[in-house]
């Protein structure tokens, strides 16, 4: 099992350059860890668009990802990959350390995003339109990471993350309505 204690360790193992010590966007198409289980010591948000053999494991059950699915992990949680020990073929991993939230509005609101405590069987399934919106949020975060770090970086990054999480709240509510 891989145990990523820092965003830097995660980037190094997954072959990504660290642009900010507390937050990273990792394109899963370019990442191939050698272990099938990863423990994240920071927040992790996975957008899974394509998995080997159309399945991926969250917890102990496998799920069909016909369009896209999101999984949310709090610091200390474990993600179990597919039975082939690979990350999804297409998607993104947003990694952000709790220290990023210090002195930002997200620090006070992170507890309101209750889906971080959902069982992995309650992953968020997205429509094509929703996937496009979430991908845009990831791209905005990635674009901000390309700027040199300054006194505004943490605030801007945390606001982009908060916007992403607000969209996820909306989509979860839609999912609950349509599943009834």
Q: Model-predicted segments: where are they?
A:
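Short, Lys/Arg-enriched, Trp-marked, Pro/Gly-tolerant hinge/linker segments that flank
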Residues: 125, 148-156, 169-180
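Histidine-centered metal-chelating micro-motifs
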Residues: 53, 71, 75-81, 101-102
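Generic protein-terminus/edge-of-domain signal
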Residues: 1-64
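Short, amphipathic alpha-helical segments that act as regulatory/interfacial helices
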Residues: 161, 165-169
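Short hydrophobic/aromatic patches on the structural cores and recognition surfaces of FHA
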Residues: 68
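A hydrophobic/aromatic-rich effector-binding and dimerization subdomain
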Residues: 7-13, 17, 82-146, 166, ...
């Amino acid at each position: 099992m891989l145990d990523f204690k820092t965003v830097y360790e995660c980037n190094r193992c997954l072959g990504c350059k660290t642009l900010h010590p507390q937050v990273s966007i990792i394109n899963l198409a370019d990442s191939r860890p050698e272990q099938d289980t990863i423990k994240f010591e920071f927040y992790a948000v996975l957008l899974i668009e394509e998995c080997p053999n159309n399945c991926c494991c969250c917890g102990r059950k496998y799920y069909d990802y016909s369009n896209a699915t999101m999984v949310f992990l709090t610091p200390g949680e474990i993600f179990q990959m597919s039975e082939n020990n690979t990350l999804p073929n297409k998607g993104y991993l947003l990694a952000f350390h709790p220290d990023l939230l210090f002195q930002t509005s997200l620090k006070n609101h992170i507890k309101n995003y209750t889906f971080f405590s959902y069982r992995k069987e309650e992953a968020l399934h997205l429509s094509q339109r929703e996937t496009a919106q979430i991908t845009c949020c990831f791209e905005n975060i990635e674009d901000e990471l390309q700027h040199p770090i300054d006194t505004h970086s943490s605030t801007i990054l945390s606001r982009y993350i908060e916007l992403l999480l607000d969209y996820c709240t909306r989509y979860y509510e839609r999912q609950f309505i349509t599943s009834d």
